[in-house]
Structure formats: structure tokens, C-alpha cells
């Protein structure tokens, strides 16, 4: 990770770390790097989620883009994968999404996509960072007709919805689907999509006010949707995050179906249809041991990457694989989109339910999970967790006690000032004890003082 760019663009507290001034410079520098070879007036799409800071940052970013001669098309509020799809569909030179995904409302972020709809390479991000750190801005400053322009393309949302519908062979007539839109970017999109697919819909977390994004709702709070599914007697629930690139499902009896299980269900179905490229799925080190055991039983190969959907996508492109993702709900169907897409993943999952005639609880039960616990600890310097001797010592002690019947993963978050402690073991009691033992040392050594 660089000085500005993390694993998912530039993020920080809006108007404090991610300021309008920085957004303006990102517009100039990022726009220049991505469009300088295009010719006159390249086109760049700009979108945002529902955060109160979104319009402020959007205005500054667009000013920067226009100042280097770029034609900006505003999409308004739309999901990150919607932007990625429309970039390629509209023949744009690049696009920018203003969002901090599942982070709290105080945060915001800016991420770029190239003309192919994929996130930027490390080299491209490094070039933008070098320009940001240059003392004097020497980029072109056109005037008159050389300046860029701004127009609206709000109908892009409907084009994206129509595309999603074409990726499945079934409608959802007869299904009652509960939706939790995290008061974020899918709030209008999801209900429109599932209504078009003839489903009965109950929705929550679909009334954004600029301040309530991810607030007790969405994919990071699936327990809220679980209760809602039971209350509404729905067949399935789908919880998205703030920018719509993740989904966590809930089955008809209120059980959480995470990204591992969604990938497992879809991989099995695609394999049966002869559509799983190289009979392989790409996942990260966070996936449950039970996920890999289940894949082996199905004779499906797996490729494992570092945490972060960008690394999953890189491995998928390198190996020409078409399914991959993360336990957190970032799932990539590379035949259909270039990034994690909550809406796409949700309709693919329900399409499997309809095609097989099985309830989600039946499909999910085919993968047995190891007990797993994840603790997120807010720290002063997350990157020092890897070289802290006391943390290393307690990890080694726990791993020795496990004797191969479990695993430990302690790592810095790529998007927040957190250390994540993940433990899997043979029993829930062991998992809880090991996780708390390691977490206590991390807190003692590194945690911020409240």
C-alpha cells in the first residue's frame, strides 16, 4: 500500500483526512494519468454513495477532472459495480467512485477504474501518488474550449439493471425476498431489480438520509436482516454494504450464509453446468477451512490470495478463472463484471435456488464450517502487528496447542486502522479462548487509549 492508496482506493475521515483539496488534486492527477493518451476531451464517469460528504467531495473531484480537459458524466448515487460496468459499456476512458464501502459515515473514499472497468494497477496508483507529492503542479491547465464539461447520466442506473437481468435464465416469481440496502447505494437499485424479476419484496435499510449508511444495517450487521427475514417469513434475505460490492445472504430460517457459502453454492452449480473455468475458484486466506474441505470433496481446485478483492481479481485474470471472492461477501463473477457485485451475486444465488428447487438452507448445509471467530481491534499503528514480539509469541503458542487442527490469522486491515484477529479451531470453546488470548495481547500492546 502507498502513502495515499490502500487496498481499495484512497480513504479517510471526510473533510479531515480526505479533504476537498485532496479530492481536487486526485481529480487532476488521477484524471491526467488515466486519460493523457486518449486525445481531446476524454470521458470519465463519476458516482457516489449516500454519505453526507459525498456531494462535497464529488464537486471538488469534478472540478479537478474538468481542469485537465475531461468531460465528466455524473451518475449520481449508484453502486460501485454499477460504475465498473458502465465504464466499459459507455466506452469511458475511466471512472471514479466516491465511497468508503462498509466503513462508518464519517469516512469516505475515492477509487478509480480504468477504461476496462478494472481497478487500477499498483503502478498506476504509484504514478498518481508521485504527482500528488510533487511540490509544484505542472499539469496542463487548458482554458476556453479546452476545459472539460459536466453532464448527467442518471439513466445509467436503468442500463445497469437491464444488464443484470440478462445474466440469469430465471425470474423470481414465487419467491419472497428480503433486502437490506445498508441505507447505501443499492437503496433504489435493489428494489427496482427484484421487482423487475417478479419477486415479492420486503426491504429495510432503504431510506438513506446521508448519515445512516451502514448504521446497524447492511452486510456487516447481518443479524438485523436475519430477524427481518423471520418476521416477514421471507424465502431468502440479501444484505448489501454501503457501496453495493458485497452481499451476505440469510436463509429462510434466519441463518447467515456468508461469502464462502455463496461461492461454494455457485461453484458447485457452475461446475455441474460445465461453466466453472478450469474447475477452479479463487479465494483469500480468510476463507473457512470447511470451505476448502468442501471444495476438495467436489473435486474443485482452489487458488488462494491475500485479503482484498483486488488480489482475487488479479489471480482470476492471470489464470482465466471466472469465479472468486471473499468470505466478507465480495464475490466476483468475471464473466459478468470486473469487480465484486452484491446485486449480481444475489441474483446468481437465487437463480441457483430456482434452478435446483432447493431452499437456501439446504444448499448452504452442503458446506460444513469450522468454528471461526474474528475480532477487530482499533490500534495506533496497524502495520506494526507483524513485527511485535509479544504478539508473535502468543500466536506461536496457540498454533502449537492447535497441533494442526485449526489456524490463526492476524493481519492489518487494508481499509481501516484495525488489526483483525481470526481464529478457527475444532470447537467453538477452543476458538473463543484462542481468539481472546491473542486479542488480549494485541490490545495490550497496540490498542488506542479510549
From Swiss-Prot:
Source domain of life: Bacteria
Cellular component, GO annotation: cytosol
InterPro entries assigned to the protein according to its UniProt record, in alphabetical order: A-D-PHexomutase_a/b/a-I (IPR005844), A-D-PHexomutase_a/b/a-I/II/III (IPR016055), A-D-PHexomutase_a/b/a-II (IPR005845), A-D-PHexomutase_a/b/a-III (IPR005846), A-D-PHexomutase_C (IPR005843), A-D-PHexomutase_C_sf (IPR036900), A-D-PHexomutase_CS (IPR016066), Alpha-D-phosphohexomutase_SF (IPR005841)
Sites of Phosphoserine modification: 101
GO terms, biological process: carbohydrate metabolic process; peptidoglycan biosynthetic process; UDP-N-acetylglucosamine biosynthetic process
Sequence positions that bind Mg(2+): 101, 241, 243, 245
Enzyme Commission no: 5.4.2.10
Reactions listed under catalytic activity: alpha-D-glucosamine 1-phosphate = D-glucosamine 6-phosphate
Keyword check for Magnesium: yes
Cofactor: Mg(2+)
Keywords, sorted A to Z: Isomerase, Magnesium, Metal-binding, Phosphoprotein
Broadest EC class assigned to this enzyme: isomerase
Catalytic site positions: 101
One GO MF term: magnesium ion binding
Modifications the protein undergoes after translation, according to the UniProt entry: Activated by phosphorylation.
Signal peptide: none
Cofactor binding note: Binds 1 Mg(2+) ion per subunit.
Family according to the record: Belongs to the phosphohexose mutase family.
NCBIfam families: glmM (TIGR01455), PRK10887.1 (NF008139)
HAMAP family attached to this UniProt entry: GlmM_B (MF_01554_B)
General function of this protein: Catalyzes the conversion of glucosamine-6-phosphate to glucosamine-1-phosphate.
Name of the featured protein: Phosphoglucosamine mutase
Species whose genome carries this gene: Listeria welshimeri serovar 6b (strain ATCC 35897 / DSM 20650 / CCUG 15529 / CIP 8149 / NCTC 11857 / SLCC 5334 / V8)
Gene name in the database record: glmM
